[in-house]
Design a protein with these regions (language model features):
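Hydrophobic, aromatic-enriched alpha-helical segments typical of multi-pass transmembrane helices
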Residues: 1-172
Length: 172
């Protein structure tokens, strides 16, 4: 199965489980079973993250191996911090640094590859600012302003494009 097909399957599952485990399940701390399902969801999301980081490397390595390597490196480095956040919730802000970093080479390669509309790459850059803004806000003021989340919509646009539109074939 082609790399893009695998991404089209994994990305939406990753997104749905992420939304449930990061946004919804933590509000259910009083419902122990649902809370634990949310924690399990976070573990599953990180397993998907590993696969997606490696698939994105494979997808973009012909375009620019160095930038593709950065996708894999940053995508994988965020995993331990994300897992740590299951036990220490504030660790999520350390993971956000790597989430922001990984969107930069993805954005660069989206623009450079010709497989996707360039504007998506620019939205991914903006998304990286959202993650950096969340981390900086947390450490400087102790909370994350709600508007910072809107910056990360670029990542959602990327996931939706991959899922529904796929990638253009590049002729060598």
């Amino acid at each position: 199965v082609k790399t893009i097909t695998k991404l089209r399957i994994l990305y939406p599952i990753w997104t749905v489980i992420s939304i449930f485990s990061l946004l919804y399940a933590p509000t259910l701390a009083s419902e122990s079973t649902l809370f634990k399902i949310g924690q399990l969801g976070q573990i599953i999301v990180q397993l998907f993250q590993i696969a997606i980081a490696l698939l994105l490397y494979k997808l973009f390595m012909e375009t620019d191996k160095e930038q593709a390597s950065l996708i894999a490196i940053f995508g994988l480095l965020g995993v331990p911090f994300s897992l740590m956040a299951i036990l220490i919730p504030d660790a999520i802000h350390l993971a956000e640094v790597f989430w922001g970093l990984w969107l930069i080479p993805i954005g660069t390669l989206v623009i450079k590859s010709g497989m996707f509309p360039k504007w998506i790459g620019y939205f991914l850059y903006i998304g990286s600012l959202g993650y950096f803004g969340a981390t900086i806000s947390f450490f400087l003021i102790g909370s994350v302003p709600a508007f910072v989340d809107y910056f990360t919509v670029g990542e959602l646009i990327w996931v939706l494009w991959i899922t529904f539109m796929g990638a253009k074939e590049i002729q060598n």
